[in-house]
């Protein structure tokens, strides 16, 4: 094995990340073109993807993207909501051009449109959902790289990276790993230092999808905690160590407590005893 192949070999840490996010679990359906990437079929239906072949295709896709001189000529598209955050981070870290949400028909073919683009490479999350972008790319001769599941068609796809492209965390991890490999090939980071940009370590969960309702609840809870802390800090401080007046003779001080300490129950008992004597 050459030193370059050993340097880019799949590490145990990356394997654990793929397994933890279930990136190796495909769908129950199987396309005949994807059969070469399937390791075996699980007893309850899902097809298990060979993570070694996933890694090989991921490296091939990273080399193709890194070969483009201008990073802005790489257009990334995904209509899947789970991949929107990953697309934003991928474009910010690699310099690619991102198209969020719905892909407008004619974006690659109609020059009159304001959103018209002439990319050199197109990267998508799912060939089924992003079929419009794949079709237009074939019209203008733009190569297409896609994350593909076991049921995904490989027609018009130049490089398919087999993985679970439907999971919230798995698709985020795949975009994170692709961005990391691209930056390694460009020489901006190294495998020894890890995915570190501007002194900050980029973790995979930064690419994960976050539910807006859950994020709003977390922000509301944080504001409530801050308000409670400020209210507690505004309360006056009580000095429990302050000393009271000094008492010289406790016997003299407590002599007057006898009559003052009578309760209503004592008075009632005395009255009842007087009535019985009467």
From Swiss-Prot:
Record's protein name: Small ribosomal subunit protein uS2
Subunit structure: Component of the small ribosomal subunit. Mature ribosomes consist of a small (40S) and a large (60S) subunit. The 40S subunit contains about 33 different proteins and 1 molecule of RNA (18S). The 60S subunit contains about 49 different proteins and 3 molecules of RNA (28S, 5.8S and 5S). Interacts with rps-21.
InterPro entries: Ribosomal_uS2, Ribosomal_uS2_CS, Ribosomal_uS2_euk, Ribosomal_uS2_euk/arc, Ribosomal_uS2_flav_dom_sf
Keyword Repeat (UniProt): no
One Gene Ontology term from the biological process aspect of the record: ribosomal small subunit assembly
Residues with the N-acetylserine modification: 2
UniProt-listed Pfam families: Ribosomal_S2
Alphabetical list of NCBIfam families matching this protein: uS2_euk_arch (TIGR01012)
Subcellular location: Cytoplasm
Subcellular location, principal: cytoplasm
Upper classification of the organism: Eukaryota, Metazoa, Ecdysozoa, Nematoda, Chromadorea
Family statement: Belongs to the universal ribosomal protein uS2 family.
Keywords of this entry: Acetylation, Cytoplasm, Ribonucleoprotein, Ribosomal protein
GO cellular component: cytosolic small ribosomal subunit
PROSITE patterns noted in UniProt: RIBOSOMAL_S2_1, RIBOSOMAL_S2_2
Function noted in UniProt: Required for the assembly and/or stability of the 40S ribosomal subunit. Required for the processing of the 20S rRNA-precursor to mature 18S rRNA in a late step of the maturation of 40S ribosomal subunits.
Region (Disordered): 258-278
HAMAP family assigned to the protein according to its UniProt record, in alphabetical order: Ribosomal_S2_euk
GO MF annotation list: structural constituent of ribosome
């Amino acid at each position: 094995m050459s030193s370059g192949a050993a340097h880019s070999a799949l590490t145990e840490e990356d394997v654990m990340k793929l397994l933890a996010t279930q990136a190796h679990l495909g769908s129950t359906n199987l396309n005949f073109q994807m059969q070469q990437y399937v390791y075996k079929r699980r007893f309850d239906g899902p097809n298990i993807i060979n993570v070694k072949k996933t890694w090989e295709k991921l490296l091939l896709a990273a080399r193709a993207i890194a070969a483009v001189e201008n990073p802005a000529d790489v257009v990334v598209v995904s209509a899947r909501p789970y991949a929107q955050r990953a697309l934003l981070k991928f474009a910010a870290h690699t310099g690619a051009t991102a198209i969020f949400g719905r892909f407008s028909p004619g974006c690659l073919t109609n020059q009159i449109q304001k959103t018209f683009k002439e990319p050199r490479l197109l990267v998508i999350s799912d060939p089924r959902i992003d079929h419009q972008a794949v079709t237009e790319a074939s019209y203008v001769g733009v190569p297409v790289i896609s994350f593909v599941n076991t049921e995904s068609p490989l027609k018009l796809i130049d490089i398919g990276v087999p993985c679970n492209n439907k999971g919230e965390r798995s698709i985020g991890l795949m975009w994170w790993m692709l961005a990391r490999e691209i930056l390694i090939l460009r020489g901006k980071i190294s495998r020894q230092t890890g995915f570190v940009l501007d002194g900050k370590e980029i973790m995979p969960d930064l690419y994960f999808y976050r539910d807006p309702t859950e994020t709003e609840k977390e922000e509301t809870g944080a504001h409530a905690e801050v308000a409670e802390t400020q209210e507690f800090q505004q309360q006056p401080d009580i000095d429990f160590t302050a000393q009271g007046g000094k008492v010289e003779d406790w016997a003299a001080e407590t002599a007057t407590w006898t009559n003052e300490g009578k309760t209503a129950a004592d008075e009632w008992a005395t009255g009842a005893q007087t009535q019985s004597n009467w």
